[in-house]
Amino acid sequence: MAKQQTKRAQASEERDDGLREKMVAINRVTKVVKGGRILGFAALTVVGDGDGGIGMGKGKSREVPVAVQKAMDEARRKMVKVSLKDGTLQHTVVGKHGAASVLMQPAPGGTGIIAGGPMRAVFEVMGVTDIICKCIGSTNPYNVVRATLNGLMAVNTPAEIAAKRGKTIEEILG
């Protein structure tokens, strides 16, 4: 059952607005009431523009398609921009959320995306082509995606680092 959910969760599509969508996880949840159980679904999705834009959303509903649509809409509303350099990150960064930690390292061209599960979905829709990642601690999809986004928001361009240090970009790059 888990393998079927995983394959279904990897379904990706591109809409007419040019954004890439990927479903990360679908959970079946139950609420126990006096009359029995009430089934529901929770969906976790990521949306990206293929050029450093990324958004994460979660949706809940009694039916899977409605939950997925809610998650996609939330992901579109919460999109943020990350600066990339030749299809990879500017520098090594660690992202944390709860018990999940994600180590992300830039990689030379041709390496590909070396990342597992939820992290891979984030990088594919975001437009990253070369990266090396390791998930440490919790492997809960929601926490891993949040940790990945927290790490990506901490990426600085050489211009931002130079401005913080009061130096020129040439001094930073060496």
Swiss-Prot record:
A cellular-component GO term for this protein: small ribosomal subunit
Residue intervals of the S5 DRBM domain: 19-82
Gene3D superfamilies (alphabetical): 3.30.160.20, 3.30.230.10
Family matches, as InterPro entries: Ribosomal_Su5_D2-typ_SF (IPR020568), Ribosomal_uS5 (IPR000851), Ribosomal_uS5_bac-type (IPR005712), Ribosomal_uS5_C (IPR005324), Ribosomal_uS5_N (IPR013810), Ribosomal_uS5_N_CS (IPR018192), Ribsml_uS5_D2-typ_fold_subgr (IPR014721)
UniProt keyword annotation of GTP-binding present: no
Subunit structure: Part of the 30S ribosomal subunit. Contacts proteins S4 and S8.
Family annotation (PANTHER family): MITOCHONDRIAL RIBOSOMAL PROTEIN S5
Protein name (database record): Small ribosomal subunit protein uS5
